[in-house]
Amino acid sequence: MLQPKRTKFRKVQTGRNRGLAKGTEVSFGTFGLKAVGRGRLTARQIEAARRAMTRHIKRQGKIWIRVFPDKPITEKPLEVRQGKGKGNVEYWVAQIQPGKVMYEVDGVPEELAREAFRLAARKLPFKTTFVTKQVM
């Protein structure tokens, strides 16, 4: 699963997930999966969607993952009283804003790419849409 090799700080504050995304255009592949909603994408969800796509396209073409989980999420253990400091880092997330292209694929027919992205979208916690590269 994806996570940073090293970070400046072990834990971060919760923060908010506002604004519009960068990386809204398909830049590496021909087809992309774009977020319509906003939310957190865990490293496990990123990997589950990647596996679903890879299994469907069966080693044809190439897949790019355009998101990286760089925010640590902490949790306290079960049945522990409040206080006594912040909990331990349990998992990593990528903050996703509307318009972000999360996955791209190239070298496969459009029907195959659509079905692969449909399977991947089932693993994600918000709505997505299929996009194609704009040719100038």
UniProtKB/Swiss-Prot annotation:
One of its GO terms (biological process) is translation. One of its GO terms (cellular component) is cytosolic large ribosomal subunit. One of its GO terms (molecular function) is structural constituent of ribosome. InterPro entries: Ribosomal_uL16, Ribosomal_uL16_bact-type, Ribosomal_uL16_CS, Ribosomal_uL16_dom, Ribosomal_uL16_sf. Keywords: Ribonucleoprotein, Ribosomal protein, RNA-binding, rRNA-binding, tRNA-binding. Gene3D superfamilies: Ribosomal protein L10e/L16 (3.90.1170.10). Belongs to the universal ribosomal protein uL16 family. NCBIfam families: rplP_bact. Part of the 50S ribosomal subunit. Binds 23S rRNA and is also seen to make contacts with the A and possibly P site tRNAs. This is Large ribosomal subunit protein uL16. It comes from Vibrio cholerae serotype O1 (strain ATCC 39315 / El Tor Inaba N16961).
